[in-house]
Amino acid sequence: WVPEKQKAFYSGITDALREYIDARYGIDAMEMTTAEIFKDLKSSGVPADLYEEMKTLFETADFVKFAKASASDEENAAALPAAVRFVTVTYQSQLAEEEAARKAAESKSSAKKEGGEA
């Protein structure tokens, strides 16, 4: 990993995650600090392990981007898979929530129809 390329690498990952967090959770992440994002994200239902993994990723990115630090090879190798895991798991939970809401609405609708015909 070339240290000069780490800033662009982490900026790309965190910018994409900020956009996703905004779209998924309605948190204006593009205009917030890492601390502000994770303060708001804490109450959003993100599983604790994913929350901590993303918080670590964002904090590492902040050090690389703003403190001119270099991340370890292990941190670099783990960054993209962690971001993909976060999006995959939280998106799947969103789909499950939407499916449950759809089924509940269908059940309520069919119960009204059955009750109305009796």
Per-region residue spans from a language model:
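Membrane-proximal, non-transmembrane interaction modules
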Residues: W1-A118
